[in-house]
C-alpha cells in the first residue's frame, strides 16, 4: 500500500489516497476505514473507493507531533474487519499551528499594536498572512480550547468597555475566514460590538482598511452562526468530531492500548449510520455548550435561566397552539423562534417523566376519545453514554387527498435533506409534476430547528447516501407492529401525519393497497442504518366519505432497536387502525409461548398520567394483543402441516453432468477430479455418485417453498413494486405483519390479499419473524429456549434444513469470501493448477518445490478458514444468540482475533508473491523466492507476537476444553453446537477439532520448510533465507513449548497451594516458623515436582511429594485429601537451596543424599526415587536451581504470627487515624467556606455593590501532599499592608478634603507611593516564584496574583477617586479574611500530615531493633561472612579492572601498530597499483604493436600463399612441357628399336629383377603404344587438347594404377606375386598419370636436350611419376614377350618397343 502523502500539519484535513497493487481489487459493496494509531490517540475515518485499487480519505487532526501508523481496514457485513495494508504519516507543527496557539493564549492580553508584535517571533509580514487564513481556521478547529475560554479571553459576562479582541486582530490582518470562524465561537457576537481602547469596533476597522467583504458580512450579520465543526464527547476516552467543510466524521479514542480495533470501528459505524441519533446528540451537545458558555447578544438572561432550569416558555403552551404557531410559518423574529424551539426540545429531553406521561396520555386517548391522529411515533430510548433518557423526533406533517398522498410517495416527492440555503424551520412541501398538493391543507414540519442540526443533516445526507444504498440492497427494513382498532367513535378532524426521524429514505413508490414503510432503529454492532420513510394509511384516504364519517382512527407506535453491546432497549410498535367500529377483525400471528410479553414490561416504560381505570384499559388492550399473538391453536396446525411436508423439502433432483474446472463434492468435501459426478438440477449441488445420500437437503426447494409461504405484505424492501390502478380502492387487513430481521436476504414485497383473515402461511412467517426479533433483542441473560428449538417449532424442518437456512441468511457473505480464496488452492498440487505444457517445461526439482510451496499456501488457507469458523460461526453465535459473557467466550477462544490477523497478513504476503510470479496468464506461476516472506513472518515483532498469542492459546487449551465440556451440559448450548456443526461452513468441525487444529498449526511449518529446502539449490540467497526461517520457526516452537510448560507448572503450583492446609507449618533449624503464607510469594515459582521416598532413621520409606521451587525444596505429605508439611525424624521439611549439595548413595542407583550446609546447622536427607533416570533428573534440576538461587536469605523465612499481627494492627491504626484526620480537615475546610459564603452575603446586604468575594478557599484538601502555607502567609501580609494603606488613605482624604488643591495632596501622593512599593505585583510575583511552586489548587497562584493586581489597581484608583475608600476597605478586609481562612485550613492539613509522619517514624524505629534482635549472632556471622566475601569480590574487581586497563592499553598499542602497518601497506599497495597501471599501459602498447605485426604477418602470409599458387601453376606448366619433350623423344627413337626375343628366358628374368629394383617403372605393351601413336597422329577435329587417356576411359583407372604401384612398393617380400600383378597390370590398358593434351606432337630438339640436362628433386620425381632416365633404362631391359599377344596388330607387331 502506498500513501499519497507522508507529512501533514497537526490539524490534518488533507486528502490522502491509498493505492494498492494492481492485483488487489477493492470490493464495491464493502466499507473501508483509515485507522491512525498514535502513541496516545487513535482516529477512525471512513474512506471512499475511487478506483478498483485506490481509496480516498481525509486525514484527521492530531494533538501530538509524531509519526502515526496508518492502516486500512476492510469491513464487510457479517465478520470482523480485515487489515489490508499499512503505512505511516508524520504530523508536523507548522507556522499556522504555532500562531493559533499564540492567539488562544493571548486573547485577553491584546493591544492595538498586537497585530504587529505577534508576528515578530514568526518573522511574518502582513502581506504573507492571507495565505495562512484557511490554515489558521483549521488549526483553531483542532485545538482543545480551555474551559470557559471566549473570544474576549475569559468567561465572565462582565467585560471591559474598551478592549482589543481577536476580531479586531482578524480585521487588521485582513483574514475573512478567521473573522467568520471567531464570530461563531463563544463571545464572538459580543466582541463584534465591543470597541477597543481607541474606541474602534471591528466594523470601523474594516471600513478604514477598505475590506469591503468584511464590511458587508458584518452589516448583514443577524445573530450567532454555527461553527464549521461539531465535537461530541461520548465518554472520557472517546470523542466524535464532524467537520462540515470536508463532511468528515472522525472518532478519536484515547489510550489505544486499552481498546480493540474492532470495537472502535464498530463504535464509529454505530454513530455514522445512526444519523437521527447523532443529529440529536450533537444538537444537545451544542445546546449544552451554549448553556455553559455565554456567547453574547443572542442570549439573554432569561434564556440562560431557562437553559439552567431545563424548561422553556413553550412548555407551558398547549400542543395545539404549538403546532399552530409552527404552521404559521417563519415569523419576523426567526432566530428567537428557533431558540424557543430549541429550548422546547431540550426541555422535553431533560424532563425525566415527560415521555412516559406523554405516552400514557396518548394511549389513554384510545378509550376516552380525543383528537384524530393517523400516525404518531413515540420512541422510548435509553442512551447510556450521553444520558439522554428518550428522544422524541417529530417530522413532516401533511394533510393530503388520495391523489396527493400517492404523489408524496413518488421517487422525487418528499426530501428531508434541506439545501444549504433553506431554513431548518421552513416549510417542507411535497410536490410532484403531475399531481398538486392542496396548499391550504399543507402544514410545516417539526424538525430540529438549529442550524447546527440542519447542517449536519445535510452533510450526512450528501456524504453517506451512496453507501447507504448498498446497505439498503442487502438489508430489509424491519417493522414490529400490531393492528387494533379503536373502541369508540369520535369526531373527525383533519389528519396529521408525522414522519419519524430527520432524514427520509430516497426509496418510495409503494402500491396503493396497504401502503406502509418501516422504521428501522437497530443499533446492533454491525452496520445499521436508521431509516425513516413516509407513513401512510390508504384505508383512511380511499374516499372523502371516510374523512367525514366520524370514524376515529389512531395509530400508536413504540419503536426500539435491538440490543447492542449489553444495553437493553425495548422495542414494540403498535398500530391500531380500522375503517369502522362495526368492521372489526383481529387476526394476529403468534410466537412460541415462551416469548410472551408480560404486562409488567410495559409498566416500566409507559407511565400514564391519566386515571387508574384508563391505565387498566390500556394494559388490557396490550394484554389482549399479546394473548392473541400466543394462541396455541395455530401452533398445532402449523406443526402438523410442516411434518407432512418435511420429506419433500429434502429431496434433490440429481442429473449426470460433466464439469470443467476443479469442483468440490458437497457430501465428502473432496475434489471432483474427472470421476462420474452428479449435479442437482435445482440447487446446482455437485457430488459423487456414492455420496448422494450424504448430501445435505436441497436448499432451492426449501427456498421456493419458503418464498411461496411468505406473507403477502410489504416489509419495507428496497425492490421496485407495481403500483395498482388508481381507481381500485382496497381495504387493508387489520393485521399488520412483523418484519424479518435486518440481516435476512429475502424480503417480502407483495401486497396484502383482500381477505381480512390471515392464512396459515402468514402465521408461520409471523412466528418465524417474531422468533428472529426476540432472539436478537433479548437481554444478556440466557433465554429459556434455544434458537434452534424456535425454528423447529415455527418451520418443522429438520436440523439439516435449518442449517441451510442459517447459511443462506447469516453466513452466505462469509462463505463467498472464504470460497474465493479456497477455489484458487483447492487443487491437490501445483502441477494440477498450471497448464500441462507449462508444467512439462519445468525441471523435476522445480515442480516438487512448487508443489510444497503450494501446499504451504493451501494449508494456510485452510488454517484461516478454521479461524474464521471459530470466529464467525461459533464465537459470534455464542455472543449474539446465546448471549454468553464475553469473558467466557474469550476463555474458549483466546487471542482469536490476533491469530486471524497474523495469519491473514502472512497469507496475503504469499498470495501477493504468487501474483507477482505469474508468467503469461494467472494460472501459470513459479515462485522462485519464498524465504524472505518466511523470515519476515517469523522474526522480530512478528515472531514475538506469534510466540505470545500461540503461547496464550496453547496454554489455555486444556482450560478451554474443560469449559466447553462444562457448557455442553446445558441443553441450549448442545442445540446450538448441533446446529453449528451441521453448517456447511463449519465442514463438520466442532469446537474441539478447531482448537486442536490451531494448536497443531505451528508444528507443520518446519516440515514444509524442510521439504522446500530439500528442493532448493544450495549456496543461493533463497537457501540461506530458508535455513534462517527454519531456525526461527524452531525457536518459536521452543518458546511456545516453554511458555506452555511454565503456564502448566504455574497452574499446578496454584492447585497444590490450594490443597495445602492453611494451619500447617514446620520449624526451621534457626527456630523460625515456616507457614503456608510464606509460599504465596510471587517470586517463587515451581521448577519441578514429583513423588519421592524419604528414608527414615528406622529404614522405612515414606511417600512424599517433593516440590522444587526457585529458592527452597519443599516436602509435603498428603492427609485427608490435603497437603501438610512432612514430619519425618523431626527434620524440617523446607530446605533452603543455598549451600545444598546432592550426592549419590553408594551401591544404590535410585538413592541420593541431600546435604544442607546451612549456618544454622547442617542437615542430611536420604531420598529415593523410582528409577535411576528419575534420580539423575532430580539431581540435575537441583543443581541448576542451586546455581540460579539468589544468595541472600533475608525475606525467605516467615516472621512469627504475633509480630506480624502487631505490625498489621499498628499499620491499620495509623491508617484509621489518617482517615479520621482527613475527614476532620475536610469538615474544617467546609465550615470555613460556609463562613466565607456568609460574609459574602453580608457584604451584599451592606449595600456595597463593588465589593466582590469568592466564597471558596484558595486550597483543597489533598491526601497526597500537604499544602504550602508560606505563600498564603506572604499574600496575607501584603493584603494587611494594603488594608493599612487604604485606611490611612481614607483618613488623609477626610482631612485634606477641604483643601484638595493644597500641598497636602503632594504629601498624600508621596505617602501612598512609599507605602505601595512593598506591595507591588512584581515584587509579589517574584517572592512567590522564589519560594517554588505550590502543591495546592493550581488556580491558587493566579488567584493570589489577581488579588494583588486588583489591590494595586484599586490603590491607583484610590489616588484618583478618594470617595470610594469605604468600599475599598471592605474589599480588602474580605480578601484578607479569605486568605486567613485558607491559611488556617492549610495549617490544619499540615498538622495532620506531621502527626501521621511522626507515627510512621515511630513505627519504623520500633521495627528496627526487633529485626536486629531476631537475627541474633547467626545473622551477624552471616553478614560478616558476606561482607568479607564482598570485599574479596571487590578486590578481585579492582584487580580485574587493572588487568583490563593493561589489556586495553596493550590493545591500543597493538591497534596503533597495526594501523601504522596498514598505512604502510596501503601506501605500498598504492605504489604497486601505480606501477601495475604503468605496466598495464606498457603492455597495452606492446599488444597494439603485436596486433599490428600480426596483421602484417597475415598479409605477408596471404601473399606467400598467392606466390605458392603461382609456383604450382608454373610447376604444372613445366610438367606439361616435360611431357611434350618425352613424346618428341619417343617419336625420334622409333628408328632405333631394341629387339628382344619373345621367348628368351634371360630377358624375362632380367625384366623381373629390374622390375623389382625400379619401383616407379611402367610397362606398356605394344598395342597401347601403337594405339597412342596412332591417336597422336590423328587430327583433333574439335580443337580440344589431346588426352593420354584411351577413349571411353575414366579417371578411376588412373587411381587404380596408382594403388597398384603403392602395393608393389609396400610388399617386396613376395616378388612372384608382385611380378605377376605387375605383368597383369602392364598388359592391361594402363595410361600415364597427369598427361595433358598435346597440340603439337613434335617439338624441337633443343627443348628436349634442355629438359634432359635438368636434374629434378627426388621428391618431385616421386610425386610426378617415373623419370625419363628410368624409363630409358627400363626400355632397354623390357622383354619382347608381348609380341605374341599383339599378333593381331598387323605387321608392326614383331617386336615390342618402349618409348619415353
Curated annotation (Swiss-Prot):
The keyword Zinc-finger applies. InterPro entries: ARHGEF28_PH, C1-like_sf, DBL_dom_sf, DH_dom, PE/DAG-bd, PH-like_dom_sf, PH_16, PH_domain. Residues 1473-1522 form a coiled coil. Keywords: Cell membrane, Coiled coil, Cytoplasm, Differentiation, Guanine-nucleotide releasing factor, Membrane, Metal-binding, Phosphoprotein, RNA-binding, Zinc, Zinc-finger. Residues 288-335, 483-525, 709-761, 774-799, 1186-1207, 1574-1598, 1612-1700 are annotated as: Disordered. GO terms for molecular function: guanyl-nucleotide exchange factor activity; RNA binding; zinc ion binding. Phosphorylated on tyrosine upon stimulation of cells by laminin. The modification Phosphoserine is found at residues 312, 314, 478, 623, 1535, 1604. Its main location: cytoplasm. SUPFAM superfamilies: Cysteine-rich domain, DBL homology domain (DH-domain), PH domain-like. Residues 1421-1700 are annotated as: Interaction with microtubules. Residues 1369-1380 are annotated as: Mediates cytoplasmic retention and interaction with YWHAH. One of its GO terms (cellular component) is cytoplasm. CDD domains: C1_p190RhoGEF, PH_p190RhoGEF, RhoGEF. A zinc finger (Phorbol-ester/DAG-type) spans 651-698. Residues 1294-1303 are annotated as: Interaction with PTK2/FAK1. Homooligomer; forms cytoplasmic aggregates. Forms a complex with MAPK8 and MAPK8IP1. Interacts with RHOA. Interacts with microtubules. Interacts with YWHAE and YWHAH. Interacts with PTK2/FAK1. Interacts with NEFL. Interacts with CTNND2; prevents interaction with RHOA. This is Rho guanine nucleotide exchange factor 28. The gene is Arhgef28.
Amino acid at each position: 500500500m502506498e500513501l499519497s502523502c507522508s507529512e501533514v500539519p497537526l490539524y490534518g484535513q488533507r486528502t490522502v489516497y491509498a493505492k494498492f497493487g494492481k492485483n488487489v481489487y477493492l470490493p464495491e459493496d464493502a466499507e473501508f476505514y483509515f485507522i491512525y494509531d498514535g502513541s496516545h490517540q487513535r482516529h477512525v475515518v471512513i474512506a471512499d473507493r475511487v478506483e478498483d485499487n485506490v481509496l480516498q480519505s481525509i486525514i484527521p487532526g492530531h494533538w501530538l507531533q509524531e509519526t502515526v501508523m496508518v492502516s486500512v481496514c476492510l469491513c464487510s457485513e457479517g465478520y470482523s474487519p480485515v487489515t489490508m495494508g499499512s503505512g505511516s504519516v508524520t504530523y508536523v507543527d507548522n507556522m499556522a499551528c504555532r500562531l493559533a496557539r499564540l492567539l488562544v493564549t493571548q486573547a485577553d492580553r491584546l493591544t492595538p499594536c498586537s497585530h504587529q508584535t505577534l508576528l515578530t517571533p514568526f518573522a511574518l509580514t502582513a502581506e504573507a498572512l492571507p495565505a495562512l487564513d484557511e490554515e489558521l481556521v483549521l488549526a483553531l478547529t483542532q485545538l482543545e480550547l480551555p474551559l470557559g475560554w471566549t473570544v474576549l479571553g475569559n468567561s465572565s459576562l462582565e467585560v471591559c468597555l474598551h478592549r482589543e479582541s481577536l476580531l479586531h486582530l482578524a480585521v487588521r490582518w485582513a483574514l475573512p475566514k478567521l473573522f467568520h470562524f471567531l464570530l461563531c465561537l463563544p463571545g464572538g457576537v459580543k466582541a463584534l460590538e465591543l470597541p477597543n481602547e481607541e474606541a474602534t469596533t471591528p466594523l470601523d476597522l474594516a471600513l478604514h482598511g477598505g475590506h469591503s467583504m468584511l464590511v458587508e458580512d458584518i452589516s448583514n450579520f443577524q445573530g450567532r452562526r454555527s461553527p464549521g465543526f461539531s465535537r461530541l464527547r461520548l465518554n472520557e476516552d472517546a470523542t466524535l468530531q464532524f467537520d462540515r467543510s470536508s463532511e468528515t466524521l472522525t472518532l478519536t479514542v484515547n489510550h489505544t492500548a486499552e481498546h480493540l480495533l474492532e470495537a472502535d470501528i464498530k463504535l464509529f459505524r454505530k454513530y455514522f449510520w445512526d444519523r437521527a441519533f447523532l443529529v440529536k446528540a450533537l444538537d444537545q451537545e451544542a445546546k449544552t455548550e451554549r448553556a455553559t458558555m455565554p456567547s453574547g447578544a443572542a442570549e439573554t438572561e432569561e434564556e440562560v435561566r431557562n437553559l439552567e432550569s431545563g424548561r422553556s416558555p413553550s412548555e407551558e403552551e398547549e400542543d395545539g397552539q404549538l403546532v399552530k404557531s409552527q404552521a404559521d410559518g417563519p415569523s419576523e423574529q426567526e432566530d428567537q423562534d428557533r431558540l424557543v424551539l430549541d429550548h422546547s426540545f431540550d426541555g422535553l429531553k431533560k424532563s425525566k417523566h415527560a415521555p412516559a406521561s406523554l405516552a400514557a396520555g396518548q394511549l389513554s386517548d384510545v378509550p376516552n376519545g380525543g383528537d384524530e391522529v393517523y400516525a404518531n411515533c413515540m420512541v422510548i430510548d435509553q442512551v447510556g453514554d450521553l444520558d439522554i433518557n428518550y428522544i422524541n423526533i417529530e417530522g413532516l406533517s401533511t394533510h393530503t387527498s388520495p391523489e396527493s398522498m400517492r404523489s408524496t410517495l413518488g421517487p422525487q416527492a418528499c426530501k428531508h435533506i434541506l439545501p444549504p440555503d433553506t431554513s431548518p424551520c421552513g416549510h417542507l412541501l411535497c410536490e410532484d409534476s403531475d399531481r398538486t398538493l392542496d396548499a391550504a391543507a399543507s402544514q410545516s414540519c417539526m424538525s430540529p430547528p438549529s442550524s447546527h442540526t440542519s447542517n449536519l443533516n445535510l452533510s450526512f445526507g450528501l456524504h453517506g447516501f451512496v453507501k447507504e444504498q448498498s446497505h439498503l440492497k442487502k438489508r430489509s427494513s424491519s417493522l414490529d407492529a400490531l393492528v387494533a382498532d379503536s373502541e369508540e367513535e369520535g369526531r373527525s378532524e383533519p389528519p396529521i401525519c408525522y414522519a419519524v426521524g430527520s432524514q427520509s429514505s430516497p426509496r418510495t413508490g409503494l402500491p396503493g393497497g396497504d401502503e406502509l414503510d418501516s422504521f428501522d432503529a437497530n443499533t446492533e454492532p454491525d452496520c445499521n442504518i436508521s431509516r425513516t420513510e413516509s407513513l401512510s394509511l390508504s384505508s383512511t384516504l380511499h374516499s372523502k366519505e371516510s374523512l367525514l364519517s366520524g370514524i376515529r382512527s389512531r395509530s400508536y407506535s413504540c419503536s426500539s432497536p435491538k440490543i447492542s453491546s449489553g444495553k437493553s432497549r425495548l422495542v414494540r410498535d403498535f398500530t391500531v387502525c380500522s375503517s369502522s367500529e362495526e368492521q372489526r377483525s383481529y387476526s394476529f400471528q403468534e410466537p412460541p409461548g415462551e416469548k410472551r410479553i408480560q404486562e409488567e414490561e410495559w409498566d416500566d416504560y409507559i407511565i400514564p398520567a391519566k386515571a387508574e381505570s384508563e391505565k387498566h384499559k390500556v394494559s388490557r388492550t396490550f394484554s389482549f394483543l399479546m394473548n392473541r399473538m400466543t394462541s396455541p391453536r395455530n401452533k398445532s396446525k402449523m406443526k402438523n402441516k410442516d411434518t407432512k411436508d418435511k420429506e419433500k423439502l429434502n429431496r434433490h433432483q440429481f442429473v449426470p453432468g460433466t464439469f470443467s474446472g476443479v469442483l468440490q463434492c458437497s457430501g465428502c468435501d473432496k475434489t471432483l477430479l474427472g470421476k462420474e459426478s452428479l449435479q442437482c438440477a435445482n440447487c446446482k449441488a455437485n457430488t459423487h455418485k456414492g455420496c448422494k445420500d450424504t448430501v445435505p437437503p436441497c436448499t432451492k426447494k426449501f427456498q421456493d417453498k419458503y418464498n411461496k409461504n411468505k406473507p403477502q405484505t410489504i416489509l419495507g424492501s428496497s425492490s421496485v413494486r407495481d403500483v395498482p390502478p388508481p381507481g381500485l380502492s382496497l381495504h387493508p387487513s387489520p393485521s399488520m405483519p412483523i418484519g424479518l430481521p435486518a440481516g435476512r436476504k429475502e424480503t417480502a414485497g407483495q401486497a396484502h390479499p383482500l381477505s381480512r383473515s390471515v392464512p396459515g402461511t402468514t402465521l408461520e412467517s409471523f412466528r418465524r419473524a417474531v422468533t428472529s426479533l426476540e432472539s436478537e433483542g433479548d437481554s444478556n441473560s440466557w433465554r429459556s429456549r434455544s434458537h434452534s428449538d424456535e425454528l423447529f417449532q415455527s418451520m418443522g424442518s429438520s436440523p439439516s434444513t435449518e442449517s441451510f437456512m442459517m447459511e443462506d441468511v447469516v453466513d452466505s457473505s462469509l462463505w463467498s469470501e472464504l470460497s474465493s480464496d479456497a477455489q484458487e488452492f483447492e487443487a491437490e498440487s501445483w502441477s494440477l493448477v498450471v497448464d500441462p505444457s507449462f508444467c512439462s517445461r519445468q525441471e523435476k526439482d522445480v515442480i516438487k518445490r512448487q508443489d510444497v510451496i503450494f501446499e504451504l499456501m493451501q494449508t494456510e488457507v485452510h488454517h484461516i478458514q478454521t479461524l474464521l469458523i471459530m470466529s464467525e460461526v461459533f464465537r459470534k453465535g455464542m455472543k449474539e444468540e446465546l448471549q454468553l459473557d464475553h469473558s467466557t467466550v474469550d476463555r474458549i477462544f483466546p487471542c482469536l482475533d490476533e491469530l486471524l490477523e497474523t495469519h491473514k497478513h502472512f497469507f496475503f504476503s504469499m498470495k501477493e508473491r504468487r501474483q507477482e510470479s505469474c508468467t503469461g496468464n494467472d494460472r501459470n506461476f513459479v515462485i522462485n523466492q519464498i524465504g524472505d516472506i518466511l523470515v519476515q513472518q517469523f522474526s522480530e515483532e512478528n515472531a514475538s507476537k506469534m510466540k505470545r498469542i500461540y503461547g496464550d492459546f496453547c496454554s489455555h487449551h486444556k482450560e478451554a476444553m474443560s469449559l466447553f465440556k462444562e457448557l455442553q451440559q446445558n441443553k441450549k448450548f448442545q442445540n446450538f453446537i448441533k446446529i453449528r456443526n451441521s453448517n456447511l461452513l463449519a465442514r463438520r468441525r466442532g469446537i474441539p477439532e478447531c482448537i486442536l487444529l490451531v494448536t497443531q498449526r505451528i508444528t507443520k511449518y518446519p516440515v514444509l520448510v524442510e521439504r522446500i529446502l530439500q528442493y532448493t539449490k544450495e549456496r543461493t540467497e533463497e537457501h540461506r533465507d530458508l535455513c534462517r526461517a527454519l531456525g526461527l520457526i524452531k525457536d518459536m516452537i521452543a518458546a511456545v513449548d516453554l511458555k506452555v510448560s511454565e503456564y502448566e507448572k504455574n497452574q499446578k503450583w496454584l492447585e497444590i497451594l490450594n490443597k495445602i492446609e492453611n494451619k500447617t507449618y514446620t520449624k526451621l533449624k534457626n527456630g523460625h516458623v515456616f507457614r503456608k503464607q510464606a509460599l504465596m510469594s510471587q517470586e517463587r515459582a515451581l521448577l519441578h515436582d514429583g513423588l519421592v521416598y524419604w528414608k527414615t532413621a528406622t529404614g522405612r520409606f515414606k511417600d512424599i511429594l517433593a516440590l522444587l521451587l526457585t529458592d527452597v525444596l519443599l516436602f509435603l505429605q498428603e492427609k485427608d485429601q490435603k497437603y501438610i508439611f512432612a514430619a519425618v525424624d523431626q527434620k524440617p521439611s523446607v530446605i533452603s537451596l543455598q549451600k545444598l549439595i546432592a550426592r549419590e548413595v553408594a551401591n544404590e542407583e535410585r538413592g541420593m543424599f541431600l546435604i544442607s550446609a546451612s549456618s544454622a546447622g547442617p542437615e542430611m536427607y536420604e531420598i529415593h526415587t523410582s528409577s535411576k533416570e528419575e534420580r539423575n533428573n532430580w539431581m540435575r534440576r537441583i543443581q541448576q536451581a542451586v546455581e540460579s538461587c539468589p544468595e541472600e536469605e533475608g525475606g525467605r523465612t516467615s516472621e512469627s504470627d504475633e509480630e506480624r499481627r502487631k505490625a498489621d494492627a499498628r499499620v491499620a491504626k495509623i491508617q484509621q487515624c489518617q482517615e479520621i484526620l482527613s475527614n476532620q480537615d475536610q469538615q474544617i475546610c467546609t465550615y470555613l467556606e460556609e463562613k466565607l459564603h456568609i460574609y459574602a452575603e453580608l457584604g451584599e446586604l451592606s449595600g456595597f455593590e463593588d465589593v466582590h468575594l469568592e466564597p471558596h478557599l484558595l486550597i483543597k484538601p489533598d491526601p497526597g501532599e500537604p499544602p504550602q502555607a508560606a505563600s498564603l502567609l506572604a499574600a496575607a501580609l501584603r493584603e494587611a499592608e494594603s488594608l493599612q494603606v487604604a485606611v490611612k488613605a481614607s483618613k488623609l482624604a477626610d482631612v485634606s478634603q477641604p483643601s484638595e488643591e493644597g500641598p497636602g495632596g503632594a504629601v498624600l501622593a508621596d505617602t501612598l507611593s512609599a507605602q505601595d512599593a512593598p506591595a507591588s505585583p512584581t515584587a509579589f510575583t517574584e517572592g512567590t516564584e522564589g519560594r517554588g511552586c505550590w502543591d495546592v489548587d493550581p488556580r491558587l497562584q493566579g488567584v493570589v496574583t489577581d488579588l494583588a493586581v486588583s489591590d494595586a489597581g484599586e490603590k491607583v484608583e484610590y489616588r484618583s477617586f478618594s470617595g470610594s475608600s469605604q468600599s475599598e476597605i471592605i474589599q480588602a478586609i474580605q480578601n484578607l479574611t479569605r486568605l486567613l481562612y485558607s491559611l488556617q485550613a492549610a495549617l490544619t492539613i499540615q498538622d495532620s500530615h506531621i502527626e501521621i509522619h511522626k507515627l510512621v517514624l515511630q513505627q519504623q524505629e520500633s521495627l528496627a531493633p526487633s529485626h536486629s534482635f531476631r537475627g541474633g549472632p547467626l545473622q551477624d556471622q552471616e553478614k560478616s561472612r558476606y561482607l568479607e566475601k564482598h570485599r574479596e569480590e571487590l578486590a578481585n574487581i579492582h584487580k580485574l579492572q587493572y588487568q583490563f586497563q593493561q589489556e586495553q592499553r596493550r590493545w591500543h598499542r597493538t591497534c596503533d601498530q597495526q594501523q601504522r602497518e596498514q598505512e604502510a601497506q596501503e601506501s605500498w599497495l598504492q605504489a604497486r597499483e601505480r606501477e601495475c597501471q604503468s605496466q598495464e599501459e606498457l603492455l597495452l602498447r606492446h599488444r597494439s604493436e603485436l596486433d599490428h605485426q600480426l596483421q602484417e604477418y597475415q598479409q605477408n602470409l596471404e601473399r606467400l600463399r598467392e606466390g605458392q599458387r603461382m609456383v604450382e601453376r608454373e610447376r604444372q606448366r613445366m610438367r606439361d612441357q616435360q611431357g611434350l619433350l618425352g613424346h618428341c623423344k619417343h617419336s625420334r627413337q622409333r628408328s632405333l628399336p631394341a629387339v628382344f626375343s619373345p621367348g628368351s628366358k634371360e630377358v624375362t628374368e632380367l625384366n623381373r629383377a629390374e622390375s623389382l629394383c625400379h619401383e616407379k617403372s611402367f610397362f606398356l605393351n605394344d598395342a597401347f603404344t601403337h594405339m597412342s601413336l596412332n591417336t597422336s597422329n590423328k587430327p583433333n577435329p574439335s580443337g580440344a587438347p589431346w588426352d593420354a587417356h584411351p577413349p571411353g576411359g575414366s579417371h578411376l583407372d588412373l587411381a587404380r594404377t596408382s594403388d597398384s604401384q603403392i602395393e608393389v612398393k609396400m610388399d617386396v617380400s613376395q616378388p612372384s606375386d608382385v611380378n605377376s600383378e605387375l605383368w597383369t597390370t602392364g598388359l592391361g590398358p594402363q595410361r600415364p598419370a597427369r598427361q595433358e593434351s598435346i597440340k603439337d606432337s613434335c617439338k624441337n630438339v633443343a627443348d628436349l636436350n634442355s629438359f634432359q640436362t635438368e636434374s629434378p628433386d627426388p621428391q618431385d620425381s616421386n610425386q610426378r611419376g617415373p623419370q625419363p632416365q628410368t624409363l630409358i633404362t627400363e626400355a632397354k631391359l623390357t622383354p619382347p614377350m608381348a609380341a605374341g599377344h599383339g599378333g593381331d596388330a598387323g605387321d608392326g607387331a614383331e617386336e615390342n618397343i618402349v618409348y619415353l
